[in-house]
Amino acid sequence: MARETFPFTSSMLRSLRLQQEWLEWEDRRRAAAQQCRSRRCPSSPRARLTRPHRSCRDPAVHQALFSGNLQQVQALFQDEEAANMIVETVSNQLAWSAEQGFWVLTPKTKQTAPLAIATARGYTDCARHLIRQGAELDARVGGRAALHEACARAQFDCVRLLLTFGAKANVLTEEGTTPLHLCTIPESLQCAKLLLEAGATVNLAAGESQETPLHVAAARGLEQHVALYLEHGADVGLRTSQGETALNTACAGAEGPGSCRRHQAAARRLLEAGADARAAGRKRHTPLHNACANGCGGLAELLLRYGARAEVPNGAGHTPMDCALQAVQDSPNWEPEVLFAALLDYGAQPVRPEMLKHCANFPRALEVLLNAYPCVPSCETWVEAVLPELWKEHEAFYSSALCMVNQPRQLQHLARLAVRARLGSRCRQGATRLPLPPLLRDYLLLRVEGCIQ
């Protein structure tokens, strides 16, 4: 007798196959759990079976996590599946619409993990509960792990909690950065210490940029971070994908008076550790070019003392003096005469007369530059750039400069230039060693007097 058969459709066969795979997965999971319980030890990460995490947009879940309500978190997250759910948030952001020709509100979905939310906001108790329920410590939902979020917000207690439970100190984001790269504010110093104690690699370069934590700290003027990384073996000679050393990034990040002081302190740490003051990036832009472009006279003088060359041009043919002249226009609220005098004392050549217009409205800086010439050049290039109210305020200086155009200077001034030429790039150091009265020494170093003689 022929055996009767039942015809299965392709969709039914697929459903049966999926059901069979699900049952096999459940059997393996239960067997692994039973084996774990029998050994009385937690299952290893390799033995843990993975399954797709479910997504959640429930406002109640969002409210509990983002507010740090421990009771609600305990009620909502009672097992491993809940602790590892993917939390989705949707926000409207402005985006340019080429078809409509104007900016429109576009919904953007962001994914993260409950543990990342709790640690980023410093909810230590909530984070501890999620970990005990089985939250994956190094899960990168939305590109970052919980340790990244905690370090970026300088949440010391949460960083310590994660590391205590076994989070990897060198876990990478999707872009290839470590938690140490995200210690970017002064308050994150203690977090950085915890990471290094837990085995974080201080010279690990990040993704395409190839920045190390030392580059990041130097770029933000974090002196204590720089000192910490140097103590743990950070290499001051490592370069980014653009050929920049940590000293380059420290000088490039110095913008504004307060920032200049912070970055100068970080640069000093690097120089004392052996950083090369002449190291240039791919565009031959040296740390001195960066310091001058940001108008940081103190930082520039520090670099010059450590061997930076004041006359070397970058890839565009601009010298540090050219960068300093441009900075006068971009950042007027500083004292450019200090920077100009330092560059001239360390071997910079007098500026081209046509460049004097950049500092025409800074009489003290203009005086320093004019005193670098044996004869005051034509004023046609800069006199028209002087503001009328500024001319009235400093009429004595501007009038004296006009009177000395193409006129012979005093013998004392010519003698000053002769001594400076003899000392060359060692002018500032040499002046302090000469047996001269303080007033004459200051005169040799282009002291501002308020008039041209």
Curated annotation (Swiss-Prot):
Transmembrane segments: none
A single cellular component GO annotation: cytosol
Domain of life: Eukaryota
Pfam short name (any one): SOCS_box
Domain SOCS box: 398-450
Start and stop residues of the ANK repeats: 56-85, 110-139, 142-171, 175-204, 209-238, 242-279, 283-312
InterPro entries: Ankyrin-SOCS_box_domain, Ankyrin_rpt, Ankyrin_rpt-contain_sf, SOCS_box, SOCS_box-like_dom_sf
Keywords: ANK repeat, Repeat, Ubl conjugation pathway
Pathway note: Protein modification; protein ubiquitination
Free-text function comment from the UniProt entry: May be a substrate-recognition component of a SCF-like ECS (Elongin-Cullin-SOCS-box protein) E3 ubiquitin-protein ligase complex which mediates the ubiquitination and subsequent proteasomal degradation of target proteins.
Family: Belongs to the ankyrin SOCS box (ASB) family.
Domain remark text: The SOCS box domain mediates the interaction with the Elongin BC complex, an adapter module in different E3 ubiquitin-protein ligase complexes.
Protein name per UniProt: Ankyrin repeat and SOCS box protein 16
